[in-house]
């Protein structure tokens, strides 16, 4: 049976977002939501017919909120809003981000507080399920009043305007609708505002980054465990009784992950008089990785709330009361997504330091730059440079976006979140850190193959090593390889969900204890 996810505004999970955004799983509006949507719409229709003054329904927008709009102009008002607010810049957002945006907006609207017609929500749903993906520029949102510019670009194809991708081809909005067999719509009162006023874009990008960060945290533990195998790491820093007296959840989880991954390894060792303890990047794995785990667990808890929230303005209450408030403001997610970027940056930063330990012959006791006949061959020399470059870039990107604000709209919107910038930065940091962790795994596998003794790996590290070596070659010397290709293969391996799934079939990995 084909899987279909019901959207009721209450129960969407981050895993559902991934299934719909990346795996093309279909979704539908849950029957339980229909009554609330229709009731909310009736209230808006009554507002227009009674000529009541309500922001965004019978008034202008932003600082023009005191300009009254006649009932006969309320429809034109909404189309004008979309045409003028679609003012984004930059490259288009990737397909998975666009699909996540459409999904989260639908899920918010079906809660029945936005006054939008059911048929209009169903039109956006039809675009999503039929694979019509609006062209949404990545830049241009202040994260308050919501993600106005990018969401306006999302709406354009619904009106037969703008641009959209269909089956990989960029078309005009109308062409995309025609090829998909979808009719365009006209907006009714308040509907333009209901579609574009909210934190949907920053939440969608941040949700994808958060999910990927959780996978990266597990991969970083694996990378660290492989480095421990290379360096004959001392295992006492991972003993449970050390961590139970400082019961930070992420720290406990990391120590357990390392123990599970290294179970049965013949490469690890115990402290001796000549070697009392390992350096921080190995010994303090639970404390460093664990801190990022705790941060990202917090961010996920915020994402879980936001993807099931109403972030529109004004809000149409069940009793007919209309509230002009600030649920569109991105600050509740801007700060967590800045936190997310910092947490991921630390993972890339410490992984790069372990790459340096692997390629440094004085620290690894292996050939310089992990290649036979160093000098004639350079091996992993510049690979470490590249990782250092990415780690340094991450440190710049990790500067919080949410500490900035530039007033807008004639100072009516005088304090904004910059939350969309925070989410986009976090995703860029994630991509950089993932490349670094992939390189650490590649370098550790190379180092293991260069070790003079060939001892049994741990229960989890052996599974990872065997899978990795099926795709990424040992580098004998420089002459017959292009290391760039091998680095790309390494990244492709760890980005394939089946790699981590196979390791987790062998050993349990988690981010919280």
UniProtKB/Swiss-Prot annotation:
Recorded coiled-coil stretches: none
Localization, UniProt: Cytoplasm
Coarse class of the protein's main subcellular location: cytoplasm
5-imidazolinone (Ala-Gly) crosslink, residue number(s): 144-146
Organism superkingdom: Bacteria
Residues found modified as 2,3-didehydroalanine (Ser): 145
Modifications after synthesis and translation: Contains an active site 4-methylidene-imidazol-5-one (MIO), which is formed autocatalytically by cyclization and dehydration of residues Ala-Ser-Gly.
GO process annotations (BP): L-histidine catabolic process to glutamate and formamide; L-histidine catabolic process to glutamate and formate
A GO term, aspect molecular function: histidine ammonia-lyase activity
InterPro entries (UniProt xref): Aromatic_Lyase (IPR001106), Fumarase/histidase_N (IPR024083), HutH (IPR005921), L-Aspartase-like (IPR008948), Phe/His_NH3-lyase_AS (IPR022313)
PROSITE patterns given in the database record: PAL_HISTIDASE
Pathway(s) this gene product operates in, as recorded in its UniProt entry: Amino-acid degradation; L-histidine degradation into L-glutamate; N-formimidoyl-L-glutamate from L-histidine: step 1/3
Catalytic activity line of the entry: L-histidine = trans-urocanate + NH4(+)
GO cellular component assignments: cytoplasm
Enzyme nomenclature, EC number: 4.3.1.3
Top EC class, one word: lyase
Pfam family, one: Lyase_aromatic
Transmembrane segments: none
UniProt KW keywords: Cytoplasm, Histidine metabolism, Lyase
Family: Belongs to the PAL/histidase family.
Protein name: Histidine ammonia-lyase
Taxonomic source organism: Streptococcus pyogenes serotype M6 (strain ATCC BAA-946 / MGAS10394)
């Amino acid at each position: 049976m084909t899987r279909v996810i019901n959207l009721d505004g209450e129960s969407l999970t981050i895993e559902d977002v991934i299934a719909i955004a990346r795996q093309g799983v279909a979704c539908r509006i849950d029957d339980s939501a229909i009554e609330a949507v229709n009731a909310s719409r009736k209230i808006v229709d009554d507002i227009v017919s009674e000529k009541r003054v309500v922001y965004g329904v019978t008034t202008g927008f932003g600082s023009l909120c005191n300009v009254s709009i006649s009932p006969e102009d309320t429809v034109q008002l909404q189309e004008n809003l979309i045409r003028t607010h679609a003012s984004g810049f930059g490259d288009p957002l990737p397909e998975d981000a666009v699909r996540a945006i459409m999904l989260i907006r639908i899920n918010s609207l079906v809660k029945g507080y936005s006054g939008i017609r059911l048929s209009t929500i169903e039109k956006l749903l039809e675009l999503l399920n039929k694979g019509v993906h609006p062209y949404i520029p990545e830049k241009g949102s202040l994260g308050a009043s919501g993600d106005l510019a990018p969401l306006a670009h999302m709406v354009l194809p619904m009106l037969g305007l703008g641009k959209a991708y269909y089956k990989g081809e960029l078309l005009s909005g109308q062409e995309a609708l025609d090829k998909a067999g979808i009719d365009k719509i006209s907006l009714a009162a308040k509907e333009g505002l209901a579609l574009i006023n909210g934190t949907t874009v920053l939440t969608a990008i941040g949700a994808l980054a958060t999910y990927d960060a959780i996978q990266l945290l597990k991969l970083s533990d694996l990378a660290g465990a492989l480095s421990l195998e290379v360096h004959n790491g001392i295992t006492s820093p991972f003993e449970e009784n050390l961590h139970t007296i400082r019961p930070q959840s992420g720290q406990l989880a990391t120590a357990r992950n390392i123990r599970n991954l290294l179970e049965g390894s013949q490469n690890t060792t115990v402290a001796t008089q000549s070697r009392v303890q390992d350096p921080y990047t190995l010994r303090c794995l639970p404390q460093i990785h664990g801190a990022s785990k705790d941060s990202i667990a917090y961010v996920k808890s915020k994402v879980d709330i936001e993807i099931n929230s109403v972030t529109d303005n004004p809000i149409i209450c069940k009793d007919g009361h209309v509230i002009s408030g600030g649920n569109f403001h991105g600050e509740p997610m801007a700060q967590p997504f800045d936190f997310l970027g910092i947490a991921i940056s630390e993972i890339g930063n410490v992984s790069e330091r372990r790459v340096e330990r692997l390629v440094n012959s004085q620290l690894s006791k292996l050939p310089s730059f992990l290649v036979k006949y160093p000098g004639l061959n350079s091996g992993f020399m510049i690979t470490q440079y590249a990782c250092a470059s990415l780690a340094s870039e991450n440190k710049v990107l990790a500067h919080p976006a949410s500490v900035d604000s530039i007033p807008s709209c004639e100072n009516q919107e005088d304090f904004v979140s910059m939350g969309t910038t925070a989410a986009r930065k976090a995703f860029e940091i994630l991509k950089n850190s993932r490349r670094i962790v992939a390189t650490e795994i590649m370098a550790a596998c190379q180092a293991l193959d260069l070790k003079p003794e060939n001892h049994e790996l741990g229960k989890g590290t052996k599974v990872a090593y065997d899978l990795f070596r099926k795709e990424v070659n040992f580098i004998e010397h420089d002459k017959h390889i292009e290391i760039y290709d091998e680095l790309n293969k390494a990244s492709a391996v760890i980005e394939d969900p089946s790699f981590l799934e196979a390791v987790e079939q062998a050993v349990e990995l988690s981010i919280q204890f």
